[in-house]
Every structure is written in C-alpha cells, then in structure tokens.
Amino acid sequence: MYLEKQTIINRGSVFVFGLTFAFSAQAQSNDKSVVDIIESQMIWVEGGTFMMGQTVVDSNESTNKSAARVEGQTPDDDSPHVDELPAHSVTLDGFYISCYETTQLVWEAVMGSNPSFFPGANQPVESVSWNMVQTFINKLNNTYHTNYRLPTEAEWEFATRGGNKSKGYRYSGSDVVDDVAWFSNDELEHPQPVGGKTPNELGLYD
C-alpha cells in the first residue's frame, strides 16, 4: 500500500509503508511514533519522464497488441492488459517512497487490530479492502496530523520501474524473476516477510 503527502516545499512525497523492525506495536508506540518509523524508510525518487503502460518489449502479448494498434485494429477488450495500452509519456515531480510494503506491524499500530489471514508482523498486510485502506489513511492523518494519500498509478509504476535509475530490466530490478519476486507455488501459499529479495534500482523491495 502506497501513501503520499505534500511537504512544506510543495514537493510530492510517496510513502510505501513496510517495516522490518522486530518489535511489537505497543513497544513501537512507546519508543517512537509510527510516522517517525515510516519516514526513516523513505527513499527519494527524482522526478522525470517515462513511458507508462505496456510497450512492445514488455511481453509477447503486448507486442501482438501493439502491432494490432498499428494496423488500426482494436485489441480484445477482455485481454488482461488492454487498459495499459497504448504506452504514453508521463512526467512526474519527485517524491519519497519507502523500500517496503505496508506491514501488519504498521497497520496494527495505527488501527489497533490486524485483519490479515496470515499473521506476521513483518509480512505485508492483506485481506483489506479499498474502504479499509481509506479508513487506515484517515486515522493515520488525524492521529499524527499528516497529509498522506494513496499515490497515482503513474507514481507507483515509475518507482517500480526504477525511476531515472532504471536499467530497463524485464522485472522490477532484474531480468531474473526469482531475484526480485516470490512466484513459485510454495512461496505463494502465504505472504513472505518484506525485504526478502533483491531491491530494484531505487532500493525498493518485493
């Protein structure tokens, strides 16, 4: 889950919550505020321009669709990536982003409960709806007088592609999926702790 706030210099800041600290939510609240911990994980993403959406090099499927577009044909509206076409140029201001996903530790520290089906403080929070996320954001902002929000799709995609440091990898940080993602049947049986794979060019994990 990704959140953004405006800084005093009007610079957008995207925050991806996710912490690997091995302590309880109660200990966290006594020693350091949730916001202090979240901000300690932030990585600056320099603003820039990139091609958003599926491109010819993204996949064989997108190659076929791009060819169809060139020929004036319309891709199948039921295809999984049709809403990612055509690729188009997007320019973004700089923002901050955390190196991890939002963990159950952070969620519980804010909400006082953990809805996740697979409990684990350092695992990403799951089993949450969009409305639940909005409630989480509102409570975080009201409690700590912050101005967080969910990022745009473009902000998220730019960061996962490596921003201005992108080396054009097939996956986020590598051409070898096992380096950067959990994908095998055994690994997908339950969520994995954050930060367990190689980071991408910006230092973002998972």
Annotate each PLM feature.
Residues M1-I9:
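N-terminal secretory signal peptides that target proteins for export/translocation
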Residues I8-I9, F21, V56, N64:
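N-terminal compositionally biased, intrinsically disordered segments and leader/signal-like regions
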Residues G12-A22:
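Bacterial N-terminal signal peptides
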Residues A25-S29:
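Boundary at the C-terminal end of the N-terminal hydrophobic targeting segment
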Residues D31-S33:
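A domain-start/cap signature at the N-terminus of enzymes
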Residues V35-P115, S129-N131:
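A short glycine-rich, aromatic-capped structural motif
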Residues M51, V56, N60, N64, ...:
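Functional-site microenvironments in short loops/helix caps that host divalent-cation chemistry
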